[in-house]
Amino acid sequence: MAIHLYKTSTPSTRNGAVDSQVKSNPRNNLICGQHHCGKGRNARGIITVRHRGGGHKRLYRKIDFRRNAKDIYGRIVTIEYDPNRNAYICLIHYGDGEKRYILHPRGAIIGDTIVSGTEVPIKMGNALPLTDMPLGTAIHNIEITLGKGGQLARAAGAVAKLIAKEGKSATLKLPSGEVRLISKNCSATVGQVGNVGVNQKSLGRAGSKCWLGKRPVVRGVVMNPVDHPHGGGEGRAPIGRKKPVTPWGYPALGRRTRKRKKYSETLILRRRSK
């Protein structure tokens, strides 16, 4: 990712950074509107997820996570910004005239060719089943259910690793550190998702975060007792408890929240690292 820094004239330009060399003019037939029913609210209008609201209006980009254009070579025409994710997207022109968006693989440039199928080269951006990949391959956009499309390792900079194949399953090490089993017939894309340094980008001011739909976060220790269990006290006081809790009194910061009886319990060989 190319990050452009401005000369210091105001605090927002002094501390902020923007991406360069990325376009933002999507094709009309590959975008659609999306329905927003209250940021962070449920059907009754009650806040279920805090710190969400506002933000700039977005158009959804239709991205090809299935990569089901088999054995048809495509060429990367543009690398574009997507407001719905941290990763960039690529516009692909296929040989049969079809145009699709895919996630931008790290290192891919305009003019590169990609293809998906069963016996395709192990090359960055190509999509193929796990059974055809050698051990140690770096992959992203991984299917969990055959034919449903990629669901794992899709964020900016995400990459998983194929570490073993045995029987009908393949063993993957996911970006979170979790090691789990997936069917060898599921497909994935070779390489790492681009825009790796997005977590090092400084927004520069609070208004830039408001454009993203994120509202301010207030610490519980500076609230009143009526608003948070950590609140109250004279001056800067500790939380007054053995362990921190949520605004509703449930244990926080360290308590495991995963449900015990899940279908994937037998597929996870090692839980994700904290």
From Swiss-Prot:
GO terms for molecular function: rRNA binding; structural constituent of ribosome; transferase activity. GO terms for cellular component: chloroplast; mitochondrial large ribosomal subunit. Residues 1-21, 225-254 are annotated as: Disordered. One of its GO terms (biological process) is mitochondrial translation. Pfam families: Ribosomal_L2, Ribosomal_L2_C. Keywords: Chloroplast, Plastid, Ribonucleoprotein, Ribosomal protein. Its main location: plastid. The keyword Chloroplast applies. SMART domains: Ribosomal_L2 (SM01383), Ribosomal_L2_C (SM01382). It is found in: Plastid, Chloroplast. NCBIfam families: rplB_bact. Part of the 50S ribosomal subunit. Belongs to the universal ribosomal protein uL2 family. This is Large ribosomal subunit protein uL2cz/uL2cy. The lineage of its organism: Eukaryota, Viridiplantae, Streptophyta, Embryophyta, Tracheophyta. The gene is rpl2-A.
